[in-house]
Amino acid sequence: MNRHDNFDFTLVCTVKFYRGKRSLPPDLSNGKYCPHFMIKTDTRYLGICFIEGQRADLETLVKSLVVPLYEEVDYSGLVCGTEFYIMEGQNKVGEGIIDEII
């Protein structure tokens, strides 16, 4: 059982990764890329995992499916239309928007 199997929702997002922050775009479809989202109007880190997505090129918008990771974290700020940064540690490596919650 994956740690993200405890949630009953998946986020459909459009994301892009910044050139100069990563040498290569991450693989969004293998369930192993687990950065954090930081809502643009907040400073809290929200642990997530990309479980499906188009092949990402740097600075290109791609669709992806994302699930939350931690039961004790409040993900209620992640609603349709929420804009966020993709964080790797202190580094903003990309950004995106939540298009749908399924």
Task: Outline where the language-model segments fall.
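C-terminal effector/interaction modules appended to NTPase cores
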Residues: 1-102
